[in-house]
Amino acid sequence: MADPARAAKLAQRIKVVVAEALGRKVKDPRLEGVTVTDARVTNDLQHATVYYTVFGDETAHADAAKGLEKAKGVLRQEVGRNITVRLTPTLEFVADQIPVVASNLEELLREARKRDAEVAALAATAKHAGEADPYKSDAPEDVDIDEDDFDEEDIDLAGDDDIDEDANKDADSSK
């Protein structure tokens, strides 16, 4: 097992070598619109997966896949010359799905912006369901209510006859 950092460096180097070889060595017209986007190498450095995109329609994608399979031997030979490992890894070419996913995300974002604009338009013309200040007091505004303005007749704690102090004294003396 190789170090993951070494595998990542090797994958990066394979990506560059394959991209350069597609531009210089391979003269297949089916591979003109091919762009190498990424490469991954297994930890044992025996297999490399090269991801690519193709500019064009579905027939261009199918032609590019056939062209890459046909050029696999030449590309592997070029990779073997330009990297320093004991065994040259086998190459596998996989069409990259990032452009498809990106276009789907752009469509979803476009739809979200459209819905946000609709909600903003509704919010601009909307009115509150109740009054502007739902916590408004029912008391007239010219009356000043002060909590310290209670009279002694309103609350008479001094003359409270409900408290039986003698019962408390009897309970303490029985102990």
Swiss-Prot record:
<feature type="region of interest" description="Disordered">
    <location>
        <begin position="125"/>
        <end position="175"/>
    </location>
</feature>
<protein>
    <recommendedName>
        <fullName>Ribosome-binding factor A</fullName>
    </recommendedName>
</protein>
<dbReference type="GO" id="GO:0030490">
    <property type="term" value="P:maturation of SSU-rRNA"/>
</dbReference>
<dbReference type="Pfam" id="PF02033">
    <property type="entry name" value="RBFA"/>
</dbReference>
<keyword id="KW-0963">Cytoplasm</keyword>
<feature type="compositionally biased region" description="Acidic residues">
    <location>
        <begin position="140"/>
        <end position="165"/>
    </location>
</feature>
<dbReference type="InterPro" id="IPR023799">
    <property type="entry name" value="RbfA_dom_sf"/>
</dbReference>
<dbReference type="GO" id="GO:0005829">
    <property type="term" value="C:cytosol"/>
</dbReference>
<comment type="similarity">
    <text>Belongs to the RbfA family.</text>
</comment>
<feature type="compositionally biased region" description="Basic and acidic residues">
    <location>
        <begin position="128"/>
        <end position="139"/>
    </location>
</feature>
<dbReference type="GO" id="GO:0043024">
    <property type="term" value="F:ribosomal small subunit binding"/>
</dbReference>
<feature type="compositionally biased region" description="Basic and acidic residues">
    <location>
        <begin position="166"/>
        <end position="175"/>
    </location>
</feature>
<dbReference type="InterPro" id="IPR000238">
    <property type="entry name" value="RbfA"/>
</dbReference>
<dbReference type="InterPro" id="IPR015946">
    <property type="entry name" value="KH_dom-like_a/b"/>
</dbReference>
<comment type="subunit">
    <text>Monomer. Binds 30S ribosomal subunits, but not 50S ribosomal subunits or 70S ribosomes.</text>
</comment>
<keyword id="KW-0690">Ribosome biogenesis</keyword>
<dbReference type="InterPro" id="IPR020053">
    <property type="entry name" value="Ribosome-bd_factorA_CS"/>
</dbReference>
<comment type="function">
    <text>One of several proteins that assist in the late maturation steps of the functional core of the 30S ribosomal subunit. Associates with free 30S ribosomal subunits (but not with 30S subunits that are part of 70S ribosomes or polysomes). Required for efficient processing of 16S rRNA. May interact with the 5'-terminal helix region of 16S rRNA.</text>
</comment>
